[in-house]
Curated annotation (Swiss-Prot):
It comes from the Eukaryota. This is Secreted RxLR effector protein 138. It comes from Plasmopara viticola (Downy mildew of grapevine). Its main location: secreted. Coiled coil: none annotated. Residues 320-335 have a biased composition (Basic and acidic residues). Belongs to the RxLR effector family. The RxLR-dEER motif acts to carry the protein into the host cell cytoplasm through binding to cell surface phosphatidylinositol-3-phosphate. It is found in: Secreted; Host nucleus.
Length: 720
């Protein structure tokens, strides 16, 4: 285009020189250079003095318009001037043109006219990068849509304490709406200002899903969501996105609408949620857990803060989703009088409490199956196999005995919440059933802290925690039992959680029995078989593959395995053997007891003072005995029966080092002495010359009032 203008200028200069020659025919001829300069000056005089400036429209930089009247130095690209010539000059210039010049001028004029006729077209986004700008891709359908405020450029300077937005702020505000393809919706119903989480209302599919629930006229299939017409979606596009006019937004909305029509409410799966951990359904063999509704506030109060933090809210939300339930609002599900609410949370116990409420049962829709005698016998057989690796107290069996005497045929629910499984848990010690002729022991709930105070440590160590956990599980009770017959309001709900007891409680609540006469004939046989099972259980309970310490046959071999003593306190005699044997028979000991340990403890108990378990001299004696064990192999053999109980199981077990074994022996001696001093003051007929029983503020063990113990034992009255 510029070449065409240069050709026109050359022609105009030539025409001007020809005109000047005609006007000065009477004057003498001069040098060619002088004639050229004179002609150029004359042409310059004929030109107007207006200076042309580029148009302000940057996209039409080939157009020019007149500017100011002043002559100012211009850039080389702006030296071109648009002038008007007389008709005589134009005709003269046309006469001097050659064929090539005419063709060039025609081509240039055609190009110029074509450029002028073309309208400015909208730039279509391409997948390639444009000049200095990154192309914005359409948003993915599975990513939440983000709304941008219309006055974003005005809000940014307010946050930066400025009155007007700067160029950087305007560019940033312009880039954000282009990235998200739309500005904030104007309609108030699209975004609820009172909603605590506005992201839900900003999602296109979620908005449409919320509207679907408001439809009152459903199709024949009530489980499928009602289809949305494209006309409604078209109106939704116009109302929700007034600024979304490009093709990318239209395509995104169409794809979203197609996906929305294919949604079905009855086929949505919880495990296919993007970005969330898949949770398994709760196991029916495990006890259901109820979660409090105000869990975030409860966590905040425990942390002494006014409001729950984001971490507390996330943790509370995860726990609720994990257990699939919140705390039941109905008070009838939980008994306020029961101190242990676990029995009411058991599925079978809840079913037993609902049996009395089922008065009107539709036989055609739902009917609980009657339990035949054969099924009851099979249940007893399974209990016989699985119950006696665990601890089943004699008080519980006596309660079962009392309940079974009033057995009548009954219904059982087809929904069995707890399945009888074997107790062969990996790397977990099996506890022997308690003997009714031995003392029942209660364990303090703060046993780790008591051990830490007695062993002079700031906090319980791992060995102390392991020992306390095992002892608590070994005796399986932390509080007194109010009576030998455990009822529904007992402190310990273990009996109600037993399968046989649950079945026995349900038998008394049965009201709808069809074959009453037939079952009554077989009732006596069922009860007789039940008593036979109890006798077999009593005989086999103490012969199971469970470690139980007995009186040694070879005292010398037992003494050789025990700890090494440096003084005569560990020397055994007939009195020590008698006390040691009685101590083994009086309790279900949690740890192995050696004769020399009994001899040392007997010396401590017979002191006139400083015999309390909390006394510093007692602690020093046991610590010195543990420090004297210098051989690792001997110490490991000494603690072999109790090694896993003290050091832990599996991957959580502590390494077998001399330091850990010494601490384990020290912890074991402190625990066993607390039990031994109780035994000595209970058996005053066997242990002579005892001082008054100490009354320390903290005890690890306590004898239950339900204990029978040795029938010939004598109980010493408590001392002040």
């Amino acid at each position: 285009m510029r070449s065409a203008f240069y050709v026109a200028i050359v022609l105009l200069v030539a025409a001007g020189s020809q005109t000047a020659a005609k006007c000065d025919q009477d004057e003498p001829q001069h040098a060619p250079s002088n004639n050229f300069m004179a002609s150029f000056d004359r042409v310059d005089q004929m030109l107007p003095s207006q200076v042309l400036q580029a148009s302000r429209n940057l996209k039409d930089d080939f157009m020019f318009s007149a500017g100011d009247e002043e002559r100012t130095p211009l850039a080389p690209s702006k030296l071109l001037k648009k002038v008007k010539f007389p008709d005589s000059v134009i005709s003269t210039a046309s006469a001097m043109r050659t064929t090539e010049d005419v063709n060039a001028i025609e081509i240039a004029s055609k190009n110029l006219n074509q450029l002028r006729s073309n309208k400015r077209q909208r730039i279509v986004q391409t997948p390639n990068k444009m000049a200095g700008q990154a192309v914005v891709t359409p948003p993915a359908l599975d990513i939440p849509l983000v709304s941008v405020a219309n006055e974003k450029s005005l809000k940014l300077p307010k946050r930066r304490t400025r009155k007007r937005p700067t160029a950087v702020v305007e560019n940033a505000a312009r880039s954000v709406p282009q990235h998200d393809y739309h500005s904030a919706p104007q309609d108030s119903f699209k975004i609820n200002a009172e909603a605590p989480n506005a992201r839900l209302y900003n999602q296109l599919i979620t908005q449409k899903a919320l509207q679907l629930e408001k439809n009152e006229h459903l199709e024949k299939n009530a489980r499928e969501e009602e289809l949305v017409s494209f006309d409604l979606l078209h109106l939704f596009e116009k109302s929700a996105h007034p600024a979304a006019g490009n093709r990318q937004e239209a395509n995104a909305i169409k794809v979203a609408s197609k996906n929305l029509i294919q949604l079905e409410s009855n086929t949505r799966k919880r495990n296919n949620v993007v970005g969330q951990v898949k949770r398994k359904r709760p196991n029916r063999d495990r006890s259901p857990v109820s979660v409090a509704n105000g869990k975030p506030l409860g966590l905040a109060k425990r942390r002494k803060s006014n409001h729950p933090t984001a971490v507390a809210k996330n943790a509370a939300s995860s726990v609720k989703q994990h257990d699939h339930r919140v705390a039941p609002p109905e008070p009838s599900r939980l008994d306020a009088k029961a101190l242990d609410g676990r029995i009411n949370n058991q599925q079978i116990t809840q079913k037993a409490s609902q049996l009395d409420k089922n008065e009107h049962v539709d036989k055609r829709s739902w009917r609980e199956e009657l339990v035949s005698v054969d099924e009851l016998m099979h249940l007893f057989d399974e209990f016989d196999k699985s119950a006696h690796p665990t601890t089943v107290s004699r008080q519980e069996t006596s309660a079962i005995e009392a309940t079974s005497k009033s057995l009548i045929p009954a219904e059982s629910s087809t929904h069995k919440g707890i399945a009888l499984t074997s107790n062969d848990v990996v790397e977990v010690g099996v506890h022997a059933p308690p003997d009714p002729d031995k003392f029942l022991v209660l364990v303090a709930d703060n046993m780790p802290m008591i051990l830490a105070e007695r062993l002079k440590t700031t906090s319980p160590t791992a060995i102390m925690n392991n020992a306390a956990r095992f002892v608590t599980q070994h005796y399986e009770r932390l509080a007194h039992l109010e009576s030998s017959t455990t009822n529904a309001e007992a402190l310990s709900g273990r009996l109600i959680n037993q399968p046989i007891t649950q079945k026995a409680l349900q038998l008394d609540k049965s009201q709808h029995v069809d074959d009453v006469e037939d079952i009554e004939k077989q009732f006596s046989r069922a009860v007789g078989h039940f008593w036979h099972l109890r006798e077999v259980n009593d005989k086999s309970a103490h012969t199971t593959a469970v470690y139980r310490q007995t009186v040694p046959d070879d005292w010398n071999a037992e003494y050789a395995k025990g700890p090494k003593t440096l003084s005569q306190d560990g020397k055994i005699n007939n009195d020590v053997k008698e006390v040691h044997a009685a101590f083994l028979e009086a309790f279900n000991l949690p740890f192995h007891q050696y004769p020399q340990e009994t001899a040392i403890m007997l010396k401590i108990v017979q002191r006139k003072n400083k015999s309390s378990p909390n006394n510093f001299r007692t602690f020093k004696t046991f610590k010195l005995l543990a420090q004297n064990q210098m051989i690792l192999s001997h110490l490991q053999e000494l603690l072999a029966p109790d090694l896993k109980k003290l050091l832990g199981y599996g991957n959580m077990a502590l390494p077998i080092t001399l330091k850990n074994l010494k601490e384990a022996l020290n912890v074991k001696l402190v625990i066993m002495y607390d039990l031994f001093i109780i035994f000595c003051h209970e058996r005053v007929d066997l242990v002579k010359d005892l001082p008054p029983k100490p009354t320390p503020s903290q005890w690890i063990f306590e004898i239950s009032t339900l204990s029978s113990g040795n029938k010939n034992r004598q109980v010493l009255p408590p001392h002040d």
